Swiss-Prot record:
The keyword DNA-binding applies. It comes from Rhizobium meliloti (strain 1021) (Ensifer meliloti). Pfam families: GreA_GreB, GreA_GreB_N. Keywords: DNA-binding, Transcription, Transcription regulation. GO terms for molecular function: DNA binding; RNA polymerase binding. Coiled coil: none annotated. Belongs to the GreA/GreB family. HAMAP family: GreA_GreB (MF_00105). One of its GO terms (biological process) is regulation of DNA-templated transcription elongation. Necessary for efficient RNA polymerase transcription elongation past template-encoded arresting sites. The arresting sites in DNA have the property of trapping a certain fraction of elongating RNA polymerases that pass through, resulting in locked ternary complexes. Cleavage of the nascent transcript by cleavage factors such as GreA or GreB allows the resumption of elongation from the new 3'terminus. GreA releases sequences of 2 to 3 nucleotides. This is Transcription elongation factor GreA. SUPFAM superfamilies: FKBP-like (SSF54534), GreA transcript cleavage protein, N-terminal domain (SSF46557).
Length: 158
């Protein structure tokens, strides 16, 4: 069975756009760089050629990865999400029970996570602790920096 990869519509569009760019813009640019480096002669000591081949390998690997992710994507329509229990797509406002610092996170797919933008991966320790909880619940998160306790202040959708 192929594991589905949950993601938002925005995350899906970003993957499609990166795939398009890598196939239609980056791939031809790299092929041109390889041809140009080949024209310089001896390939065994041609740093430009080896760098271009390495870039090609990296690009083709990422294309394969993107094609796989897109094929397995399970796009979650956040506009249809509701309820008081936290699940994928929820925007959750928390307060650190020790420091009283408030934080807001949206639970998104692994490929969309960006803590600086307030988007955390569904597979992160904090998201795993939040799933199924409601406003007023407290959670304890065992993260690499140690154990932290949070209270859930709000759950929003969309």
């Amino acid at each position: 069975m192929v594991d589905k990869v949950p993601m938002t519509q925005g995350g899906f569009v970003n993957l499609q756009e990166e795939l398009r760019w890598r196939q239609q813009e980056e791939r031809p640019r790299i092929i041109e760089a390889i041809a140009e480096a080949r024209a310089h002669g001896d390939l065994s000591e041609n740093a430009e050629y080896h760098a271009a081949k390495e870039a090609q390998s990296h690009n083709e690997g990422r294309i394969s990865e993107l094609e796989d992710l897109i094929a397995r994507a399970e796009v979650i329509d956040l506009s249809k999400m509701s309820g008081s229990k936290i699940k994928f797509g929820a925007r959750v406002k928390l307060v650190d029970e020790d420091t009283e610092e408030e934080k807001t996170y949206q639970i998104v797919g692994d490929q969309e996570a960006d803590v600086k933008q307030g988007r955390i991966s569904i597979s992160s320790p904090i998201a795993r602790a939040l799933i199924g909880k409601e406003v007023g619940d407290s959670i304890e998160v065992n993260a690499p920096g140690g154990s932290k306790a949070y209270e859930i202040l709000a759950v929003q959708w969309g």
